[in-house]
């Protein structure tokens, strides 16, 4: 079923360029994390919980600027979640997956439900990352990564909310 996507849980983000001031080192350490953000968050709480907000198929017309980061596809799986650390909202996550990426062994991605995306991705053994872009939404930091599972792309955008340990801890 294709959803008529009216709005995202993510507010509009401003992606940084080389002309923007440098990102503070402690923040950059979090945003440039190459491993599982879920695992990193687990170092700062006793309980990680995912609250799915939207899980559905969408068309390319719903991608907006994300379309430039993904190949043409008949449809895309969209997953938007709130990641909670000890019952505090820490992160808004938006994952867009071309239908072709779901073929073969990755169809489990559409049934993650309350399972953190990182638990699936980083247990696959076939994960690579093409890039990380850093962005802002007011005082909040964000990042966008194009990842590949067995060479097939998916796009992950994460907005770190005010209660996130990114703002309250030194790099750990």
UniProtKB/Swiss-Prot annotation:
Residues binding substrate, per UniProt: 37, 79, 117, 158
One GO BP: pyruvate biosynthetic process
NCBIfam families assigned to the protein according to its UniProt record, in alphabetical order: PRK11655.1 (NF008656)
EC number, as in UniProt: 4.1.3.40
Pathway(s) it belongs to: Cofactor biosynthesis; ubiquinone biosynthesis
Molecular function terms, GO-annotated: chorismate lyase activity
Matches recorded under SUPFAM superfamilies: Chorismate lyase-like
Main localisation: cytoplasm
Entry annotated with the keyword Lyase: yes
Protein name: Probable chorismate pyruvate-lyase
Catalytic reaction annotation: chorismate = 4-hydroxybenzoate + pyruvate
GO cellular component, one term: cytosol
UniProt cross-references to HAMAP family, sorted A to Z: UbiC (MF_01632)
EC class: lyase
PANTHER family found in the cross-reference section: CHORISMATE PYRUVATE-LYASE
This protein's UniProt keywords: Cytoplasm, Lyase, Pyruvate, Ubiquinone biosynthesis
Localization per Swiss-Prot or TrEMBL: Cytoplasm
Role of this protein: Removes the pyruvyl group from chorismate, with concomitant aromatization of the ring, to provide 4-hydroxybenzoate (4HB) for the ubiquinone pathway.
Protein family (similarity comment): Belongs to the UbiC family.
Keyword Cytoplasm: yes
Alphabetized Pfam families for the sequence: Chor_lyase
């Amino acid at each position: 079923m294709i959803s008529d996507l009216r709005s995202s849980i993510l507010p509009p983000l401003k992606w940084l360029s080389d002309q923007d001031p440098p990102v503070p080192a402690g923040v950059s350490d979090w945003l440039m994390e190459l491993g599982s953000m879920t695992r990193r968050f687990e170092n700062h709480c006793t309980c990680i919980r995912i609250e799915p907000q939207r899980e559905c198929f969408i068309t390319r017309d719903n991608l907006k600027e994300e379309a430039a980061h993904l190949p043409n596809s008949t449809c895309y799986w969209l997953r938007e979640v709130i990641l909670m650390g000890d019952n505090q909202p820490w992160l808004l996550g938006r994952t867009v997956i071309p239908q072709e990426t779901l073929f073969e062994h990755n169809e489990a991605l559409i049934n993650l439900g309350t399972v953190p995306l990182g638990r699936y991705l980083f247990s696959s053994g076939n994960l690579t990352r093409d890039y990380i872009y850093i962005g802002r939404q007011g005082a909040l930091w964000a990042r966008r990564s194009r990842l590949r599972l067995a060479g097939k792309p998916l796009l992950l955008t994460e907005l770190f909310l005010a209660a996130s340990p990114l703002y309250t801890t030194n790099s750990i």
